Structures are given as structure tokens and as C-alpha cells.
A protein has these predicted regions:
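Residue-level preference for non-acidic, small/hydrophobic
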Residues: 46, 76, 119, 153, ...
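Flexible, acidic/glycine-enriched loop-and-adjacent beta/alpha segments
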Residues: 64-115, 168-173, 231-235
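Short, functionally critical alpha-helical segments immediately adjacent to catalytic or ligand/cofactor-binding
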Residues: 71-101, 154-161, 188-196, 302-307, ...
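Non-catalytic, structured segments within soluble enzyme domains
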Residues: 20, 107, 111-279, 283, ...
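Surface-exposed patches in mature extracellular/periplasmic domains of secreted proteins
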Residues: 84-93, 131-132, 154, 228-233, ...
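Short pre-catalytic segments that frame enzyme active sites
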Residues: 47-61, 172, 199, 261, ...
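N-terminal type II signal-anchor transmembrane helix
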Residues: 1-44, 103
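Terminal hydrophobic membrane-targeting helix
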Residues: 24-73
Length: 398
């Protein structure tokens, strides 16, 4: 039996060393460069207007490590890998303990995956529940440590870790669950996010034990940061989290224009749109349409621009983006259509410049026929003799 165990051990060690040598001379593995990310559009106060799905249907927003809450980074390491900066991809003590409890005494399955090992599993789709998969995961973790700094590894993990459903990475998770950028979250929110990747399927906003699990981590946090003891009152408050159905989808025509702008390549896009002004514009437009509904006006488009720098402050492409009866998804601002009465001031101005009329010139607002074409006014009526200035103000066509 001992001889068999020794033989198996030698074979496994040989395979492990061979695999390590192969990976050492293999090309550098990609961490984030070939990953497709979501895009997020913000207003002028950096409030989220819309976040898109990535090409593989994930909410995954790239966030550099420098833009991630330091408390979240530290809490994640406390929860997932306390010795992250001390090992080279594998924690041999934790791994040995896990192997003994899982396969030796067989009490319960214990995890011992480091941040690097978890990143390897996520990045390369490794099934780590099998022994062969676990060995491959270890080899890949060591390979990652060979080629990348701890900072790069941590950044990649925090951008790819699972946070429930199709939410990946702290950038998207923070926006979905707390409607905040990940550099603006509080300590309770940071600790809440840090406990989700360990069991993303169960640690959801609907889980009533989530607060208890988070507060247990806070107790460990206080051992390292006793100065945060005065924040305990924050952890006694109800844990309020949003879900994907609460994710903003505001000013859709405007955000579509921004997202389709080929010159914008970054994932997080700050715009000039003023959300407070946008709300006012939408309210005024809806009230106007409610008054004009009886005369057949059901749709409108509005563009509000700051003339000083031509930045867009508010925009409505239609009265209701989701209303099929008015073709609401068509952006009226971009649609080519007749200029209508827009040209009238210019025509009157040209006539004034050429001396053809003056403001008190009397014009005839009566029926005319031009080679079979019979123009009408918007009210289908004629006013007879009318001064030029009044004809312009009243938008007469004849």
C-alpha cells in the first residue's frame, strides 16, 4: 500500500513539474486585454443613466484598481485571501488543511483557493471540483504569478469575480446593488460586496442572512481596524440593496447616440446631460402633449443645448421610448423631416432686407392656387387682409 502511494505521489509530482515547465515557457496568459466589458453612461454629476451588457451578456464594467474603494479591496482580501501578498499563487498550509479535511477525515469540503487560483478558474474555465482540475488550477495560478504583479492580479480578479446572476466585477456590482460608483461606497457596502463572490448564487439581496454574514466579517475587520468601532451603528441599520430590475435606463435616445459614437472608446462615459433639467423638460413636454392630444398631437422631440459650448443639457427623442403606437424608439431629433414654419422668419427677413415689405405691409391671407397646388394654413382657415408682422406671429402660410 505504501509502495502504491509512493508511486502515485511520484507520478503526480512528475506531472505537476512537467506542467509547470510547459506553462513557464508558454506565452503569457491574458488577464483582461481580451475580455469584453459593458459601457456605462453618466450625467454631469456622475449619476448612472444606463449600463449596457457585454457581448457575452454580462454586466461587467472595467474599473482600474486605483478607482476601487480601498476598504473593498482590503475587505475582499480579508474574506478571500489574507495571505495574498505572501504566497506565489498557492497557500500550501491552507491547501494541505483543505485536502486533509475533504479527502482525509472527510468531515466537509473546505475551500483553500487563493485570489490567484480563483482568477485562474474564472479566466480559463477550470472545473476545480475534480482533482485533475484542481491541479490545473494550481498550475495556472502559479503561471499567472510568474507573469503579473500582485496589483495586476488583484485588479483582474476584482473585475471578473462573480457577484450573482450575470453580474461580474465590483464596478458593475456596485452600480447594480447600490447605484454608486465603486469608489464612493461606504464601509458597510464595501463589506457586503466582499462576501458575495464566495457564494454568489445564494448571497443575493433577497437573502436575509446576508446582513448577518457581513456583520461577522465586520467583527473580524474591527480586529485590524479598532478605530472603526464607532461605525457599528451603520451596521445595525437595515441592509438596503437594489436588484437588476432597478438598474437605470434613462434618456434612451441620448444614451444611444453616445454609445454609437465611434470616437468614444472608454467604458465609463461622463456626459454633459443635466438630469434635473431633463426631468423638467420631460414634465413640460408631457403636460404640453396632454393639452394638445385633442387636436391630434401625440409626439414631440426636444433638444436643449448650452449655446456657450454646444453641450447637450436635455434631450427627448420622443414622448415615450416604449410606445409603439407613436414609434417611440425613433429619435425625432435625428429624423429628417420638413422644416415647416422654421423657414418663415428667414423668408420674412429676406423680404425686409430687399425692401419688398415692411412690418405694416398688408398681405392677403386668402385661398391661392399654384398650378394645381392649393396651400392651406394649419387651422384650415383664412384671415383675409393681415399685416406682415401679424402674419409671421400667427404663422400664416399664404
Amino acid at each position: 500500500m505504501k509502495k502504491l502511494f509512493k508511486t502515485i505521489s511520484i507520478i503526480l509530482l512528475t506531472l505537476f513539474v512537467s506542467g509547470l515547465l510547459i506553462l513557464f515557457f508558454s506565452p503569457t496568459p491574458e488577464l483582461l486585454s481580451d475580455v469584453n466589458f459593458s459601457k456605462a453612461v453618466y450625467d454631469d454629476q456622475h449619476q448612472l443613466l444606463r449600463m449596457t451588457l457585454s457581448k457575452d451578456e454580462k454586466f461587467r464594467l472595467y474599473t482600474p484598481l486605483s478607482k476601487i474603494s480601498k476598504e473593498l479591496v482590503e475587505a475582499t482580501l480579508l474574506q478571500e485571501d489574507q495571505y495574498f501578498y505572501s504566497h506565489y499563487g498557492v497557500n500550501p498550509i491552507a491547501l494541505g488543511k483543505a485536502l486533509w479535511q475533504t479527502y482525509g477525515v472527510k468531515t466537509r469540503r473546505v475551500g483553500a483557493s487563493t485570489i490567484s487560483m480563483q482568477l485562474a478558474r474564472i479566466r480559463f474555465g477550470i472545473n476545480s471540483r475534480q482533482v485533475s482540475g484542481k491541479l490545473w488550477q494550481i498550475l495556472r495560478a502559479i503561471q499567472i504569478e510568474m507573469h503579473y504583479s500582485k496589483k495586476q492580479i488583484l485588479e483582474a480578479y476584482l473585475n471578473l469575480a462573480p457577484y450573482g446572476g450575470n453580474i461580474e466585477g465590483v464596478g458593475a456590482a456596485s452600480l447594480v446593488y447600490f447605484n454608486k460608483s465603486v469608489d464612493r461606497i461606504s464601509l458597510p457596502e464595501a463589506l457586503t460586496l466582499s462576501i458575495i463572490p464566495q457564494n454568489p448564487g445564494k448571497r443575493t439581496p433577497q437573502n436575509h442572512n446576508l446582513k448577518h454574514i457581513r456583520n461577522h466579517l465586520f467583527a473580524r475587520w474591527l480586529v485590524k481596524h479598532p478605530e472603526d468601532g464607532n461605525k457599528k451603528v451603520m451596521f445595525d441599520l437595515p441592509l438596503v440593496m437594489h436588484t437588476l430590475k432597478d438598474l437605470p435606463f434613462k434618456v434612451p435616445h441620448f444614451t444611444q447616440q453616445v454609445l454609437h459614437d465611434a470616437s468614444i472608446t472608454k467604458q465609463s462615459i461622463d456626459t454633459s446631460l443635466d438630469s434635473r433639467t431633463q426631468i423638467i423638460v420631460e414634465r413640460i413636454t408631457k403636460h404640453y402633449l396632454a393639452r394638445k392630444k385633442m387636436v391630434g398631437v401625440f409626439n414631440a422631440a426636444v433638444l436643449l443645448v448650452d449655446t456657450r459650448d454646444l453641450s447637450v443639457k436635455a434631450q427627448m427623442g420622443s414622448a415615450d421610448f416604449f410606445n409603439k403606437q407613436i414609434s417611440g424608439q425613433i429619435n425625432g431629433i435625428e429624423t429628417k423631416r420638413s422644416p415647416g414654419s422654421t423657414l418663415k422668419p428667414f423668408i420674412y427677413g429676406l423680404a425686409l432686407d430687399q425692401g419688398l415689405i415692411h412690418p405694416n405691409t398688408v398681405l392677403k391671407d386668402v385661398p391661392h392656387s399654384f398650378n394645381g397646388y392649393n396651400p392651406e394654413n394649419f387651422d384650415y382657415e383664412f384671415m383675409g387682409p393681415i399685416k406682415a408682422k401679424d402674419a409671421l406671429v400667427l404663422s400664416r402660410n399664404i
